[in-house]
């Protein structure tokens, strides 16, 4: 999340500087992963590198460039031949469908709701698995929502912000206000956050946290206040006790509201737009899987089970999750399945994209691609007229007041932005005819990187050129400026 962050104060708050940047951390990590893989398997090249990316990156202007940045880092590694960036929920779906076939001996044919709650983002994605061509399985994204914005120094309202807020709450509870605020946000504080995460992971692994909550419930905070974890967390030379009431209070303040909101949205959209009632069992062709490191946290699982009405006899996780480790490794194992060709992704548009132009004195949005429609990779989709023919635009005029990205939910969720002056001039200069006439389209590459297509139109001959001029949009913020309401 921080790799695309333009607010320097947010980056510095997490102890990065001009040398040790989030991008540097990503480059170092990916280089080390490739090096270790080659050393383990005795290879000197990686034919196909599949990297998972949060689907929620598509839902915010500031993170739209994330996939291009990750792809470029991977392409800079000399021994990597091909790179593919895939949504993490799609990768998890591949692994769970594979698990289902191993457990039942039958291919999975249906829908999987992936709730990916990791350290930095929350992704809820409804995917469809079907037998595809060449005996491989195809995975299609049906619906997606989530939370992942960097706001108030919080990353994605997920595991990281929970750990940070919990430790800050513990410190404020025990230390004088001035002393507490001086400690919070320091390198010592973040070392304490890491220690706290280890304690909670160990408590869940050993069953201590689950057993205690199962016995006492999560509602009586007075009783839970007297019950503490065996280990204390050290920070700034102090030992801080962690009560079960602390775990619940911070969870209710930070996680529960946004998790509830996003689950409710997914339930509504799945039923309205796809006829899938995710709150009911449907003969085994609907599965629900909670994944990501934070997905092993008891309070997260309890909230999810309550929302979807899970019972002891429920089969919506049966056959796809064999043990709790599956929740953490589903994405990485799914990447291996896609890299090896066992699963293929059915290409769907990650968002709708269009331009708003003044037509007869009124602004009108004309879309080239619509959210989640099936598309062909690298196939351009143009603005068309009422007859479905490619529409001729004049790039010498004020041809695009705004660009628009949305998710089919109306203008309330649209991201509106303007092309910067230099970029509009660059596009116009790509058209060589005097009238600057052309058709305008977009495509998505293998890693969902947006490309703009311009095909010249000869007004005298009345025909389009045989090929397009293509301009890839790597970093959105370099060529576009977000319109704030």
Listing of model-derived features with the role each one plays in the protein:
Residues 77-91, 304-334:
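Conserved phosphate-binding/catalytic loops in two-lobed NTP-binding clefts
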Residues 2, 77, 151-305:
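Gly/charged contiguous loops adjacent to phosphate- or pyrophosphate-bearing nucleotide/cofactor binding elements
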Residues 49-66, 280-307, 323-328:
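Glycine-rich phosphate-binding loops at beta-strand->alpha-helix junctions
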Residues 1-12, 134, 142-160, 165-174, ...:
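Early-domain small/polar-rich strand-loop-helix modules and first-structured segments
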Residues 83-115, 329-344:
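Conserved phosphate-binding catalytic cores of ATP/NTP-utilizing and phosphoryl-transfer enzymes
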Residues 1-3, 100-142, 335, 436-456:
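Gly/Thr-rich phosphate-binding beta-strand-loop-beta motif of the actin/hexokinase/Hsp70
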Residues 313-430:
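Acidic, glycine/GT-rich loop-and beta-edge segments that sit at the periphery of enzyme/chaperone cores
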Residues 1-77, 162-214, 476, 480-485:
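Phosphate-binding loop and its immediate beta->loop->alpha context
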């Amino acid at each position: 999340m921080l790799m695309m962050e333009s607010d320097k104060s947010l980056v510095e708050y997490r102890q990065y500087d001009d040398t040790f940047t989030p991008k540097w951390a990503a480059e170092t990590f990916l280089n080390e992963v490739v090096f270790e893989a080659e050393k383990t398997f005795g290879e000197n090249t990686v034919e196909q590198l599949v990297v998972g990316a949060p689907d929620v990156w598509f839902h915010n202007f500031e993170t739209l460039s994330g996939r291009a940045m990750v792809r470029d880092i991977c392409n800079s590694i000399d021994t990597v031949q091909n790179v593919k960036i895939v949504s993490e929920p799609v990768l998890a779906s591949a692994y769970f469908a594979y698990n289902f076939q191993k457990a039942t001996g039958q291919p999975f044919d249906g829908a999987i709701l992936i709730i990916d709650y990791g350290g930095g983002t929350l992704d809820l994605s409804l995917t469809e698995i079907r037998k595809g061509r060449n005996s491989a399985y195809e995975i299609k994204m049906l619906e997606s929502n989530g939370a992942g914005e960097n706001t108030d120094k919080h990353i994605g309202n997920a595991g990281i912000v929970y750990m940070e807020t919990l430790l800050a709450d513990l410190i404020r509870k025990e230390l004088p206000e001035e002393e507490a605020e001086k400690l919070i946000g320091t390198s010592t504080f973040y070392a304490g956050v890491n220690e706290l995460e280890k304690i909670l992971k160990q408590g869940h692994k050993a069953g201590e946290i689950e057993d205690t909550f199962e016995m006492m419930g999560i509602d009586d905070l007075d009783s839970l206040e007297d019950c503490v974890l065996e280990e204390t967390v050290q920070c700034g030379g102090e030992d801080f006790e962690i009560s079960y009431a602390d775990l619940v209070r911070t969870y209710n303040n930070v996680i529960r509201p946004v998790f509830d909101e996003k689950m409710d949205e997914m339930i509504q959209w799945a039923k309205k737009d796809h006829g899938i009632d995710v709150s009911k069992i449907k003969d085994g062709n609907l599965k629900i899987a909670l994944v990501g490191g934070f997905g092993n946290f008891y309070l997260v699982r309890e909230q999810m089970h309550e929302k979807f009405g899970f019972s002891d006899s429920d089969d919506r996780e049966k056959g796809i999750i064999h043990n709790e480790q599956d929740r953490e490794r589903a994405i990485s194992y799914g990447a291996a399945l896609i890299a090896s060709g066992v699963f293929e992704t059915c290409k769907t548009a990650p968002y709708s994209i269009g331009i708003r132009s003044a037509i007869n004195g009124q602004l009108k949005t004309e879309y080239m691609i619509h959210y989640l429609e099936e598309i062909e990779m690298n196939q351009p989709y143009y603005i068309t007229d009422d007859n479905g023919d490619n529409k001729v635009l004049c790039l010498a005029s004020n041809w695009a007041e705004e660009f628009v990205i949305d998710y089919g939910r109306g203008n309330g969720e649209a991201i509106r932005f303007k092309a910067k002056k230099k970029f509009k001039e660059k596009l116009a200069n790509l058209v060589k005819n005097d009238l600057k006439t052309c058709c305008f389209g977009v495509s998505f590459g293998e890693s969902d990187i947006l490309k703009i297509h311009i095909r010249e139109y000869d007004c005298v001959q009345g025909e389009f050129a045989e090929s397009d001029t293509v301009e890839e949009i790597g970093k959105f913020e370099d060529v576009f400026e977000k319109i704030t309401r």
